[in-house]
Structures are given as C-alpha cells and as structure tokens.
C-alpha cells in the first residue's frame, strides 16, 4: 500500500497502480480515453492530466499524465488544480475539432464515454469553425457498423483487437491527424471477439449493427442481470429490452468470470428470443387449436392422467425447470436429455472435479497460469471466453520479465518491448488447426485416441507411477517430454480438456496429468469444458440418458413423455426418436423454439427463454449463477402465455393432484431443489432472495431516465395498465427502485453512475478498478476437489490406424453454427459456413478429388452429399463433419464412414 495526497486529502492506495487507476478505485473522477483497465497505459490521449507536486511545500507543480505516473508513497497531486482542468478541457476541445455534431443520430449516444468525459471536463462550446476531416466508412460484416468520422484516435480498438484478442485484420493507417482505424479493405472482421469493440471504443466508431436495426437509447431499455446460454463458460450479460424485444446484449462485469469481454456468439446470438415463429400460446398440434392457460393445464392433465410418463430434461434449461419435471414424473422416470456417450463423459468430468487433486480455475484465474497444455479441445469454437483467457496467460512471461526490470505491468508498451516475442508456453494437441495456434509454442494434430495417448505419456513423464504408454513413437515421446518439462518448470501449470471430441480417454489422460502434477507438488489446475450452459448442472442433478428414455417408450414400459426445452433430434439417431415418439400415446413439449420435436408433439407449451424467465445454471467451472427475467411478455400482449418451464410443469403437477400451486415464486422452487439435492444446496446463495432490498427499495431494471412508459401500449389501449409485478426477484419492472453505485450489490442490471453512462461506469461498482465487484462476484462455486480420491486411469487406448475403405468421424465445432439457439439468430446465420465434409490432403489425393468436389457417403444409415473442404492439418483416415449443421446427424463422434466417393453431378 501507499499513501498519496489528493487535493489536500490523505488516501491509501495500492502502490502497484498508476495514479489514474488508484484515483478511480477511490471513486475520484479523472477523465481519460486511451486507458482501459484490461489494456494498460500508453499515454496516447493526454486527457488524464493532473498536477503533481514535489511535496506539501511545492506550490507550482507540473502537469503529468496520471495513467503513466506510478502511485508511489507520499505522492502529492491535484485533480482540481485550475491549470490541470484547463488542460483537460483543451484536450477535449481539440479532439472535438474533427468530431461530427451527430450525438442525436449516433447509436453511441447515451452510453458514450466521449460524452461523459466532455461533460466532465466542462467543455460545452465549439469554437472551431472550419472544415472537418472526413473518412470513408467500411462494411465490416453483420455484427459491427463503422463510422470513422467519430474517431478521436485513442488507439483502444487496435490495442484490444490486435494485442489483447489476437486479431490480425484490423489496423491503423495514415499519420498525424489523418489516421484511419479499419481493415485493409471492406470485409467481415475475423476475430471471434470483434463485438467487444463496441464497448472498448469510447465513441461511436464501432457500434452494434444488430442493435442499430431496431434502435433505442440505453436509457430507454429495460435490463436484468443474466447469464449467457451460448456455451458452458457462464459469462455474465446484461440484455436490454424494449417493446418486448431484446435489442442488444452488453457485457456484465464479473471479476471472476468474463471480466470486460464476451465472445461474438454470446453478444450477437440473442435473435432467437425475438423470432416470430416462437411458441407463444399453448397449442394442440394436430388440430392447431390454441388454448387458454387453464385450458392448457386441464388438457395436459387429461392427457397424462393414468399414463406411464417419462420426462426428458435438458442441459439448456435451468435447474429449477428440470427439477419441476422430475417432480411431475417422479425421480425414477426423469431423464437428463443428454445422449448416453456424452452423459458418461459428463459423469467422468464430475468425478474428476469432485475427487481429483487439482481445482478448476475461474476464467479470470486461467490468465494467471504460466504453462498450459490443451488436450483435444478447439477452445475458440467450444468455449471461446476460455480461449481469450489463454491468450492472456501466455503474456504473463512479459509481465514477469518487466517485473525483473522494475517496470510496472500497466506500462503496456514498455512491457511489450521488454518481452519482444517471449511468452509463457502453451501446447495444443487437437485434431486440426485451431485459432489459438498462433500463440502456441508447439502444436500437434492427430486422431483423438492418439491425442489421448500423448496425454497419458505426459502424465507418465511427470510421475513414473502413472500408467505408461506402449509403442509410443519417438517423435510423440519427445513432444511429451517437452510438455512435461514446461509444466514442471511452471509455478502454476494448467491442463485443459473436455467433452467435444466424444473421447473418454482424453478426459482420463487430463485427469492423470493433474494427479501427476499434484504428486510433484505443483500448484496447478485442471479445466474441463462441457457442451452446454447447464450440462454440468444436469450431471450434478442426475438422470439417465435420452436413449434410456426413448427405449422405455419404444418397449411400451412408458406411453407418455414430457420433453423440456430439448430437440431430441439433436441428441440421438432420428430413427430412434421417430420410433419412440410414434410409440408414445402422449407427447407434451415445453420449449421456446419451434423444433423437429415440437412438430411431433400433441401439446406444445410456450416456455420462457432466458429473457422471459428466471433460473439457475451451473457453468463448466462448477459456478452456480442466476439469470433473471428481463421483461414480462404479457405486458405487451395479454394473449402471450410464455411462462418458465418450472411454472408450467409444477402447475400441471398440481392440476393432476387436484391441489393449489405450492411454488408461487422462484425462491420456493430453488429451496426445493436445494433440499432435494444436497450437492446443489449452494444455489440458495447464487443470488439474493426476492425479499432483498436496498434502502427499502427493490432494484430498478430501468434507468431513471426511462421514457415513454405511459405511451408504450397506447396503440392497444389508452388505459395504462399497472406495471408488471415481479414476485420472483428483488428487481422491479420499473425505473422506480435503487439503481445507484453507492450501495454494494452483486446483481447489477446495467452499469450507471452519475456522470458515467458508458460501460466504463463499471469502475464505480468495483473494489478496485479491474478487480472484483465490491459485494463480491456473482455466483457460488458448488464443487471443490477433495484431494487424493482419484486413482490412476489405466485404459490407455491403442494407436489409431487409418483404413483404406473406412474413415473415423471427428466432430468439428464452429462458434457460429454448432450451438442450437444462437444459430437461429439472423446475424449469426450470415456467419455460418456452408455444410461441408473435411478430409486430409493425403486422403483427397488418394480419392482423386479436389477442394469443393461433392462427396457422397453413408453415415449412421443416412446418405449424405457434401462439398469437400481439404484440411491440411487433419490426419489420414479421419473425416471431419461440422457439429450441429443442417443435415448432419446427431452424436457423430467416433462413428465410421464407408462408401466415400465423389458423387455424380
């Protein structure tokens, strides 16, 4: 700690910070542009000037840039010094000489950092009366709009995009006051994290194009704290709604998880919530009859009465909804909705997390590891936010080298110059090239079984008591030794693996490496990636596979099925699903999307998406997190009967039993889950109860400037209805409630503080800028390792051997296209590649086919015709297929393809 003196006040700060960060952490306001908590200091904008004095007797002082000045002990500064204030105002004024006068039509207006800083400096009159510099804008794809004339040349965009996120197609061109930030030519921004430019940019150069198409100001949107459902990472988001539509998604700061950044799937994949073809009223499918609320409950109860019912849950539904289904059908009749192979691997992952020797790190904690081995995962496609964290972990070497030279880590340019190209080691073993390969020390591409053999070899090299690998070729053995040396040399090694390749041996090999590291007394971690937002929650919750449920229907052991938020055709073979649904006398589906399964239902119940309901998810870290309802859809249309899955299912259960509904609010069902499943007892603490208040007030979902509420339904009726009442949470569907930053709270719908309207307002909610929220980061970890309860896994697979007339399927994942719901969003659909089949160059040459040729083959009894994509990194004997794409069967990992040949045109 250090003592600094600011305008006559003596304050305690972290001496490792710069003055700007230290003062912001104290709640003091200093305007800035180029500095960002995640990017460090470069001193480019000169906006954060303060007056520094030699000591208490110095009356003259000198101007310094606070972002470039360390907060050393006994520093004397003034923020309110008149010369410093005039200097800061002059900086804003000359930045404004070329900035257009377009705030009323700029999408950034109302959450613009430039607006905030201009007001903060007191600049309110333009004296420049001459021609402004202008630029040609670029077309950057479906996610981001480009308006270069608004640029103030703070360099944040390229520092984030190139230096932080590893992008290569955005740069800065030109010189002096005529610089241009963009691509060499028009084209889609290639980075999977490009959407963060909309929050990193302090002006309106890069704006959310998906929001611009249905635009409204930040102060006119209703927000709620939510969790991204796009993968298992558990990123915190703030969805904004107007007129019953989600208009945009902003990053919600969580110092342990996503920090300041999201991936593009999570930011732009919300369009499925707004689709016109969503179920919004209960429907008898055969007669196409829409039902009332009571009619739907009576119909469901009549259909299920005296039936042998099974329930199929879902890893994309909340714990509460899955529990309500289990209560409806009985514990022995509840099935997880996950295919048997994936469920088996999930149980193994859970065993490793619970009984293994090493902890699972948070995403933020991943950045602090100094040697990483990724085994079998293409993380940018399966858990993109973890991939971004790994990009930061390799930069730890630069910080370490800078510390040895007494250079502070926030001096961004100096740290980079010291390190040059030195990085912490990252090793990647995958079936094909990944988007992280550019920062990896070494990569290897091989069949899943061979990757697992490499992992087992690494474990054995770390600790010879681990099972050895027979017949490992010398090249692989040498590679395993290099990985071993790096992991043992590290202070905090990390091994990352997961479920995506459908190979159990990969997870077992990763677990052996973790055990071996613990045996060598390394302070390491293990991170295991799972498929969906609540996959780990379902593994904790229990329930057999979807195939087991279908078998009960096909065999006649059950004659009715209730399916919760699950398209069974994406889980297992279509023929098996067809047979089971045909055998069932009653099929009831509760979902928020039209799917192949809802088309086969007798009764469809409109379930809530994440935007219309509350619930709890468990991320791949084992962190239980609550998402909250953003808006009440019935406010805009009384015919809309969308309800949370747990509400529908509990109401049906109560109707069947002829009793009143017991669970009238979320806290009731959450408490019931916690009591029924002791391992899930911690979900009580995932968020405050509905009774939580600050100064006697509920928490406001809407900014206090929210306008038009009394006119929003005037086209329906001039009589204004009562504001929807939220009995499930501590939030109000109103601007009336607490929305400030002074009182500590974890669940924050939107970031706003007086004078701070942009995303930089998160500074006001943190214990220190870039640290954790003052009230603690949202969520609660449910799983901690027990130590030495896990034995060595012994089943080392045999080497993969390519065959002349048969190919082994490896699943290939795409950030845009492999996840079910985001793929329904129009902007995401523009980024989904055409369905393809991938072969190695060796196999393509042997078959005599070229890139783009149409290949025909049989897979799981289904005939496919797909264009060929030659993959130089794919091994011979392997055939790659994109997961989740149209026409690709479910559960393809490890299947065999035969009869592969060029199809007749």
UniProtKB/Swiss-Prot annotation:
Residues the record lists as binding [2Fe-2S] cluster: 34, 45, 48, 67
Enzyme class: translocase
Cofactor mode of binding and number, as noted: Binds 1 [2Fe-2S] cluster per subunit.
GO function term, MF aspect, one: metal ion binding
All residue ranges annotated as the 4Fe-4S His(Cys)3-ligated-type domain in the record: 83-122
Swiss-Prot/TrEMBL GO biological process terms: ATP synthesis coupled electron transport; respiratory electron transport chain
Binding sites annotated in the UniProt record for [4Fe-4S] cluster 1: 99, 103, 106, 112
Residues where [4Fe-4S] cluster 2 binds: 151, 154, 157, 201
Cofactor(s) named in the record: [2Fe-2S] cluster; [4Fe-4S] cluster
Chain's gene name: nuoG
Signal peptide: none
4Fe-4S Mo/W bis-MGD-type domain location: 221-277
Listed EC numbers: 7.1.1.-
Domain 2Fe-2S ferredoxin-type: 1-83
Subunit structure: Composed of 13 different subunits. Subunits NuoCD, E, F, and G constitute the peripheral sector of the complex.
Family: Belongs to the complex I 75 kDa subunit family.
Domain of life: Bacteria
Catalytic activity entry: a quinone + NADH + 5 H(+)(in) = a quinol + NAD(+) + 4 H(+)(out)
Residues passing through the membrane, by range: none
Record flagged with keyword Nucleus: no
Source species of the chain: Pseudomonas aeruginosa (strain ATCC 15692 / DSM 22644 / CIP 104116 / JCM 14847 / LMG 12228 / 1C / PRS 101 / PAO1)
Biological role stated in the UniProt entry: NDH-1 shuttles electrons from NADH, via FMN and iron-sulfur (Fe-S) centers, to quinones in the respiratory chain. The immediate electron acceptor for the enzyme in this species is believed to be ubiquinone. Couples the redox reaction to proton translocation (for every two electrons transferred, four hydrogen ions are translocated across the cytoplasmic membrane), and thus conserves the redox energy in a proton gradient.
Protein name: NADH-quinone oxidoreductase subunit G
Annotated binding of [4Fe-4S] cluster 3, by residue: 228, 231, 235, 263
